Each structure stands twice: as structure tokens, then as C-alpha cells.
Amino acid sequence: MLLARMNPQVQPELGGADPLPEQPLRPCKTADLLVVKERNGVQCLLASQDSDAQPRETWGKKIDFLLSVVGFAVDLANVWRFPYLCYKNGGGAFLIPYTLFLIIAGMPLFYMELALGQYNREGAATVWKICPFFKGVGYAVILIALYVGFYYNVIIAWSLYYLFASFTLNLPWTNCGHSWNSPNCTDPKLLNASVLGDHTKYSKYKFTPAAEFYERGVLHLHESSGIHDIGLPQWQLLLCLMVVIVVLYFSLWKGVKTSGKVVWITATLPYFVLFVLLVHGVTLPGASNGINAYLHIDFYRLKEATVWIDAATQIFFSLGAGFGVLIAFASYNKFDNNCYRDALLTSTINCVTSFISGFAIFSILGYMAHEHKVNIEDVATEGAGLVFILYPEAISTLSGSTFWAVLFFLMLLALGLDSSMGGMEAVITGLADDFQVLKRHRKLFTCVVTISTFLLALFCITKGGIYVLTLLDTFAAGTSILFAVLMEAIGVSWFYGVDRFSNDIQQMMGFKPGLYWRLCWKFVSPAFLLFVVVVSIINFKPLTYDDYTYPPWANWVGWGIALSSMILVPAYVIYKFLSIRGSLWERVAYGITPENEHHLVAQRDVRQFQLRHWLAI
């Protein structure tokens, strides 16, 4: 099969030029031919001998790509956030706004990123050869992905620590009497509604063995008075973090050929464990009460704006658009791969997984409520408190608790690893495609990236590391990633053009996206993203962790981290504008015209300066 592909680096012609014969609006790519050969299921793309570019690596099998995308999208948030959001926002009624936002915004953005990466075969930065002024968006998402790696790997290290601690007949969070326990440690069997009173939820009680193991045994939080007093890294977590970094390096060092094989384990294991936990969970006493609470339908909650806001933010962060990962993964696909089908399949799998995980979670929460004779609302929670305190405590009361604990933390470990692999691949691919010297030394560059995340993660494994981690989690990938994806949607749909983007998709798959997708890309998705950005800013509150309130300077540091990535977008526009020689018109024209159409600028034929470009759908 022969594919005609072109991306000539045409130098701006500042002088006058004789008019050339009229050319079609979207010239075909006619430069180097890429010969596609199938060898034992591995596709090789061989450039013509005139090209100096190295052949781009491709996925060994289609399933490697699908598992990588699913593994990245399905992460810890599917387990520790969605079920609780569904419960507190009207149960089954929450699925209405959630599904609506999935259809009108989540899937279109997912589809857009896969198609963008697959057609251009570039990472998050160099993919913006379609509109050079927007390359700063690529650098922004790469930096955000790097920030996330600083703290996300620490959560994986916690999971590994818990996994190691589970290999004992008596789980260390089962009872009091350990060196880390406080004098206030209380046997969970003694806790019920009458003991806790009306103002203390069981999920907020800090003196259970499980809560003290997490905060005092693992984090050593009691030895820190705040973010100004974080102390030194803890050697146990340091060793776990080192193991995580080594695993990530050897999963990524040879590119998608190695990571595509690792995800066969990390992406499938969570489904096996989730199924086993679900089957066992529904047999426990009180499980039906938990599931009923999870699925209860309260349509009146849909009148509240917070329900719609929670649905919008959850669908965005759950699918993982905007981190450069989907672009990087898709760039290693075959040119004619059906990324439309992939987008529908993988985004649906992600959302269905979130929903199904709720049954496994709330069956256990129902069991806990039954055991302690409290209401479901007293044990329902989200985040780290759910997966590192409540769920482990529930597991410790089951027959064969060691087996269930090992299984559960293996699932968390797998969920974290393939998501972290995706984020690091976005950084590595994004920068390696932009700087060829990094691509030629991928193994060394991968080592540098993983070690850099390790070094900065050291701040998060100190005795006050949870304060640093919470700050990074709030600011590094909050408003900044929403802003970056908004700019991405505008760059593709408006400056590059939905019609031109649709023609690219037709070249790959033989059919153009329907009117629905084009309308979503041009109007609905940008409006959705703008809504979420505005809401995230309006709803911002000074940072807290439980009862601890961060000092004002910490919030300023957080906003500085957020702005450090966002500022790259306008900064690159200014840099590019100043680096282009020519008149004001020429500078703007070259900045918003795809690189393979720069020759049209010399002919004064710039689509973006014509009204029909902005009206096209």
C-alpha cells in the first residue's frame, strides 16, 4: 500500500512572485512516499531514500494501542471519584448529565485528539505544524504532563507500599498496638452510631487503625505541622518510589514496542480484580443497601448547578483529553487506522468501567455501614480516604483478608502504572519529535525524564509530603489543563478549520466526519471547555487538607505553577511572531497557516484571511 504524505519545510518568500496556476484549496500531500509493509503483524513505514527522516515506530498490534488508551484513561479516579460523585449527585440521575457531556464534548474531544495525532504522526508540540502560532499549546500540555508525573508516581508508590504490607496473616491496619498508633486509637468494632454521635461521620474518624496506618504509619503526617515543615523523605516510600520509576523506565525505554506489551497486564488486570471484588462484594451482608444507595434516583438534584458542574469536570478529567497522551499514542498508528471507531470504543469502555466500579465500591461500603450500624452516608467518601483507609479496613474483616488485600492493591498498582506510562510517553514523544537529538537517544532521554520525576517526587514522600502533593494535584493539572485544551480546540476547529480537519480524516479513513461531529468540534466542545474553565475559576477556594488551611503564600505558589504552563501559549505566539521576517501581514499569515501551505502565503492566498474559512463547517 502506498500513502502519499507531504510536509515540506517551505521557507517564507518575502519578495514578490509571479502568480502560479490556481491550486486546490487543500493540496494533496505529494512529497515522500511511505511504503507500508506488514511483517509478522508489525507495520513498518519506510520513507523514500531522499528523506533523512527516520521511519516512525508503529504499534506491534492494534490491540496494543487500544489497551494503552484504555489503560491511560481508566485510572484511580474511576475507582475513587466517580462512584462517590454518582452517589452524592442523585444516583442514577447523575448519569443523565454525565452521559450528555460524554456525547457532546467528551467523545468529540477524544476523537479529535486521536485523529490529530494519527494524521500528522507527531507528538503534542510538533503536531502544531498545522498552525505554528499554537505550538505553545503543545509545550503547555507537555509541561503539565510532567508536573502530574511528579506526584502521580507517589500515589503508585503508596499502593506498592500497601501491597508489600499485605503479605502477612495479620494486616497492619487491622488493630491498634503498633508503633505508629496514637493513644486515641480505637478498635473499629467499638465504633457505631451511638459512639460517634450525630456530628462525626465514620469516614472522617481519624483514630481507627486503618486511618492511623495511612496517616501515621505511611505518611507520618503527625510529624509535620504544615507545608512549611515537610521534613525529609521517608526511606520506605523512597524505596517504593524507586521501584515504580524503574518499572516505568523499562516499560518505556524502547517506545511503544515495550509499553504496548506491558499494558497487556496493567490494562487487563484491573478488570479481572474488579470482577472478583464485585462478585464477592455483593454476597456480603448489607451490600444491597450500599448498591441501592449508589443507584437511587433523585431527579430533583438535576435542578442544582453543582450536579452539572461535577458531571462536566468528571467527564473531562476521566477521559484524559489534553495531556498530549492521546495524540502521542495515535501518532504511532497506521495512517488508515479507523480512529473514529477507536474513539467511540475506548471512551465508552472508560465510562462503563467507572459505572461498574461503583458496584464494587458501594457493596463494600454497604457492608461497612451494616457492620458499624451506621448510615451509608457516614461511610461514603472519595479519594485517598476511600482506597487507602475505608476499603482496606473493610477487606481486613473478610475471611482470607490477605488475599483480598493483595488483589486490591495489585489493581491500584496496575491502574496507576499504565496511566503514568501514558503521561510520560506524552512528554517523551512530544519533545523527541521536536528535537531529533532526543529521538536518536531515546533510551537516555527516557532515563532523564524518569529520573527527573523521581527527584521532584521526593518532596511528596516527606513527612509533610501530602501537603505538597495536594497542592500539585490542585494547581498543576486543574485550570491550566482546561485552558490548554480550550486553546487546542480553538486552534484545530477555528484556525486550522473543521472542514480542513475533516478532509484530513477522509484521507485516512475514506469518509468525512458527519455534521454532528463538525458542529461539536466548532461550537459545542469549545463552549463546554470555556464553561468548565470559568466554573473552575469561580469555584476556587483557598486550599485546604482536612482541617489544615494552607498559608496564603502556598496558594500563590500553586497559581504560579498553574500559570507556568499557561503562559507558554501566549509566550510562544510572541516568540514566533518576532522570529518570522516580513511585514505584519506576512508574520500573521505564516503563523496561522499550516507549514505545508506556506507557499500559498507568498501568493497572498491565505485561507484564514477569508470569511469563508471561518464560516466553513
Curated annotation (Swiss-Prot):
Glycans are attached at residues 184, 192. GO terms for biological process: monoamine transport; neurotransmitter reuptake; neurotransmitter transport; norepinephrine uptake; response to pain; response to xenobiotic stimulus. Dopamine 1 binds at residues 75, 145, 317. The chain crosses the membrane at residues 63-88, 93-116, 136-166, 234-254, 258-282, 307-332, 339-362, 403-428, 444-464, 466-492, 523-545, 549-569. InterPro entries: Na/ntran_symport (IPR000175), Na/ntran_symport_noradrenaline (IPR002435), SNS_sf (IPR037272). It comes from the Eukaryota. Residues 1-21 are annotated as: Disordered. Dopamine 2 binds at residue 382. One of its GO terms (molecular function) is alpha-tubulin binding. Residues 1-62, 117-135, 255-257, 333-338, 429-443, 493-522, 570-617 are cytoplasmic. Na(+) 1 binds at residues 71, 74, 418-419. (R)-noradrenaline 2 binds at residues 87-88, 382. One of its GO terms (cellular component) is presynaptic membrane. It holds the Pfam family SNF. The keyword Lipid biosynthesis does not apply. It is found in: Cell membrane; Cell projection, Axon; Synapse, Synaptosome. Palmitoylated. Palmitoylation regulates protein levels and neurotransmitter transport. It catalyses: (R)-noradrenaline(out) + chloride(out) + Na(+)(out) = (R)-noradrenaline(in) + chloride(in) + Na(+)(in); dopamine(out) + chloride(out) + Na(+)(out) = dopamine(in) + chloride(in) + Na(+)(in); dopamine(out) + chloride(out) + 2 Na(+)(out) = dopamine(in) + chloride(in) + 2 Na(+)(in). Keywords: Cell membrane, Cell projection, Disulfide bond, Glycoprotein, Lipoprotein, Membrane, Metal-binding, Neurotransmitter transport, Palmitate, Sodium, Symport, Synapse, Synaptosome, Transmembrane, Transmembrane helix, Transport. (R)-noradrenaline 1 binds at residues 75, 145, 149, 317. Disulfide bonds join 176-185. Monomer. Can form homodimers in the cell membrane; homodimerization is mostly mediated by cholesterol and lipids, and regulates neurotransmitter transport activity. Interacts with PRKCABP. Mediates sodium- and chloride-dependent transport of norepinephrine (also known as noradrenaline), the primary signaling neurotransmitter in the autonomic sympathetic nervous system. Is responsible for norepinephrine reuptake and clearance from the synaptic cleft, thus playing a crucial role in norepinephrine inactivation and homeostasis. Can also mediate sodium- and chloride-dependent transport of dopamine. PANTHER family: SODIUM-DEPENDENT NORADRENALINE TRANSPORTER (PTHR11616:SF320), SODIUM/CHLORIDE DEPENDENT TRANSPORTER (PTHR11616). Belongs to the sodium:neurotransmitter symporter (SNF) (TC 2.A.22) family. SLC6A2 subfamily. This is Sodium-dependent noradrenaline transporter. The gene is Slc6a2.
